[in-house]
């Protein structure tokens, strides 16, 4: 990946986590051709949102760090170079914003305090250390901790913050007019409407390498979705995973759990935490079953051929589990929908799944019956043509009078010329 960034570059910044059975690497792509990747310490945990967190990193530690050769030079040349309190090159401050965006701050703070309630962090901290040690050194995080992190909506903060997707939502005894008063309480939660397909990857060093660990699939919004385990060596997936419709499809796994979340989030006064509690009970059972499956297949770790031979079995088990759970989801969805209808609530997943700017076509106006054709008025007979008046004969041409002979010209009398002078 680093080679691709060096050769091709990156149009934007991103964070990538790469892991296998031996180690986990955290990589910040700093845009352009710059990047820094570090090996995650085995005794640390990290909570990170959509921003940069790496502070000072020893770029010469080639065993634990992979970085672009000009990462520090480019920051200096661009004028964005920043240092920590000890004068060392600070990656996040040099390549990221001066302050955390509010949505990044709220999620980072919520995640740290959820996983480590005794942590000394505050909401106003200038920066959050990326790799952290739990206050309790004996703390071991579980799958359920990871699920809870993805779903969290500030429940553990005792009302200090409210998810900002609740702005304008009527609360008991409140018509929404208190939104302005509670402005500072509304924050961007970890479990928000934009967090979809937030899976959990469990790397198990005791499984055959070809299994690739376990993917705890969380289709749909993380707020109210169940996590279901699948190995990475499946040869096929259940039919409900295959529809690719852009709006609600009752045969789709994604759209079914999306609808369940949609009903739960828009009717919290009805469902409260019951949906999450239902999934948590289901997940406890799935974790027990998955541990038994892991114990069965770990015997094949050092036998690649035997591990490959059970791929059909693993696939069949996954298809059977998917079918069973999907039928349960459909039943649960139907019960929630029926309950809302009984309460007189509206619930139309087809309409709700359409984009906000979608407008239903206006119904066609009913065709008006044509007015009966009025009979044409009878044609009035034309008036009889008046006979033309007889042409009066032209008067006879009178003969011209005979030309009289000219009188003989009398000779002119000569008169003397008189001249008058005008005054």
Segments (PLM) and residue ranges:
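Long, intrinsically disordered low-complexity tandem-repeat segments
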Residues: 363-415
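C-terminus-biased signal that marks the final domain/tail of proteins
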Residues: 3-28, 33-362
């Amino acid at each position: 990946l680093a080679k691709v960034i060096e050769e091709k570059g990156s149009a934007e910044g991103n964070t990538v986590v790469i892991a296998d059975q031996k180690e986990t690497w955290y990589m910040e792509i700093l845009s352009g051709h710059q990047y820094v990747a570090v090996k995650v310490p085995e005794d640390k945990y990290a909570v990170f949102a959509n921003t940069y967190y790496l502070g000072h990193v020893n770029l010469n530690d080639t065993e634990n760090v992979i970085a672009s050769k000009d990462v520090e030079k480019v920051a200096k040349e661009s004028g964005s170079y920043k240092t920590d309190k000890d004068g060392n090159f600070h990656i996040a401050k040099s390549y990221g914003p001066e302050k955390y965006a509010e949505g990044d701050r709220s999620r980072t703070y919520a995640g740290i305090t959820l996983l480590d309630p005794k942590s000394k962090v505050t909401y106003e901290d200038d920066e959050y250390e990326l790799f952290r040690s739990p206050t309790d050194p004996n703390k071991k995080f579980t799958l359920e901790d990871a699920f809870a992190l993805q779903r969290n909506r500030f429940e553990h903060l005792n009302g200090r913050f409210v998810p900002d997707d609740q702005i304008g939502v009527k609360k008991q005894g409140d018509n929404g007019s208190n939104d302005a008063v509670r402005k500072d309480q509304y924050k961007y939660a970890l479990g928000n409407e934009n967090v979809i397909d937030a899976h959990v990857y469990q790397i198990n060093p005791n499984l055959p390498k070809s299994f690739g660990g376990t993917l705890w699939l969380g289709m749909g919004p993380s707020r109210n979705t169940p996590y279901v385990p699948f190995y990475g060596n499946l040869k096929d997936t259940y039919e409900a995973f295959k529809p690719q419709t852009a709006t609600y499809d009752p045969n789709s796994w994604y759209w079914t759990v999306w609808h369940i979340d949609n009903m739960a989030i828009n009717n919290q006064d009805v469902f409260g935490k019951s949906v999450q509690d239902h999934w948590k009970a289901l997940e406890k059972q799935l974790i027990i079953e998955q541990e038994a499956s892991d114990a069965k297949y770990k015997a094949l770790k050092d036998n690649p051929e035997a591990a490959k031979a059970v791929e059909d079995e693993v696939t069949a088990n996954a298809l059977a589990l998917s079918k069973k759970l999907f039928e349960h989801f459909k039943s649960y969805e139907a019960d929630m929908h029926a309950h809302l209808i009984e309460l007189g609530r509206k619930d139309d997943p087809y309409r709700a799944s359409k984009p906000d700017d979608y407008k239903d076509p206006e119904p066609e106006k009913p065709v008006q019956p044509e007015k009966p054709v009025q009979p044409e008025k009878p044609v009035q007979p034309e008036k009889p043509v008046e006979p033309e008046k007889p042409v009066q004969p032209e008067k006879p041409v009178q003969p011209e009078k005979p030309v009289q002979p000219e009188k003989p010209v009398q000779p002119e009398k000569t008169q003397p010329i008189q001249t008058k002078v005008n005054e």
